Amino acid sequence: MKIVTFCIYITICFLIIGCKKSTSTIRDNAYDSVEKYETELEKLCLESHNDSVTYSIRIKTEDLTNDYEYKYLGSLKIKKNNFKVIQQKILSGQYQDSQRAAVSIRLFLKGKLYGEFTGLNNFYKIKITSNSLCLYNYETKSRSIYELKDSIPNLLFFPYNDKDSLSSGDIFYFNRP
């Protein structure tokens, strides 16, 4: 009876120690692998060429939840270059209903990040057609079309409405890595 009790005790200790070690290893490596998973999702999105699929991953920590979403938008022909375009949306917050969105339009040339337009939020619907970038704002119910034939501008100004005498709207910045 003493041998059976001793074996059960050793087994339980082994399981507890084994679980603690694997959990701590996962947590230590979690911060290193977030960027790796983001890069893999970007690659999948670029290779899919399917604008009806959204690739996403949710990462939870003790006090924060981050949702990363990638959607293929299409390709832009600017001069002789053919840019692949994806939308990156990062929802971040302590709770699901209090998350804030950071949306960017990312341009890739020959599989490498060329640059991105930042400053967008969750109120924008983005559409790509040949050499045009079309933005629609759900909140203001306004739309703008940007023709990108010759070059990529450093700033895009999105007016809230055309009838307003004051220039009110959003500015999106183009950042290069």
Per-region residue spans from a language model:
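Surface-exposed acidic loop/strand-edge motifs in secreted or periplasmic proteins
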Residues: 41-122
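Positively charged n-region of N-terminal signal peptides that target proteins for export
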Residues: 1-6
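C-terminal motif of bacterial Sec signal peptides marking the signal peptidase cleavage site
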Residues: 15-18
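Acidic, small-residue rich beta-repeat scaffolds with periodic aromatic anchors
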Residues: 20-56, 127-177
